Amino acid sequence: MPKRILQGVVVGDKNEKTVVVRVERRFAHPLLQKTVRRSKKYKAHDENNQYKIGDTVSIEECAPISKDKRWTVISAQGQ
């Protein structure tokens, strides 16, 4: 099974080797057909502490690293 890859924005970088990434999804409301935005935060592994708040990054699923970390940052998009 392929690993999922998501794009999001770094919203927290205070933890050692960890960043918090907010991933936003958009969908049409089933009744109103209005576009709705929902977001979710993921803790992702950042080995070199190189990503800062506001960076747009791609994260990839991985084996559990800790209690909450199951994602790894694989690259940064253009700011």
Swiss-Prot record:
GO cellular component terms given for this protein? cytosolic small ribosomal subunit
This chain belongs to which protein, by name? Small ribosomal subunit protein uS17
Q: Please give the InterPro entries that the UniProt record associates with this protein.
A: NA-bd_OB-fold, Ribosomal_uS17, Ribosomal_uS17_bact/chlr
Keyword terms, alphabetized: Ribonucleoprotein, Ribosomal protein, RNA-binding, rRNA-binding
Q: Which domain of life does the protein's organism represent?
A: Bacteria
Q: Has keyword Endoplasmic reticulum? A: no
- Function of the molecule: One of the primary rRNA binding proteins, it binds specifically to the 5'-end of 16S ribosomal RNA.
> What NCBIfam families does the record tag this protein with?
PRK05610.1, uS17_bact
Q: How does it assemble?
A: Part of the 30S ribosomal subunit.
The entry assigns this protein to a family as follows: Belongs to the universal ribosomal protein uS17 family.
Q: Which gene encodes it?
A: rpsQ
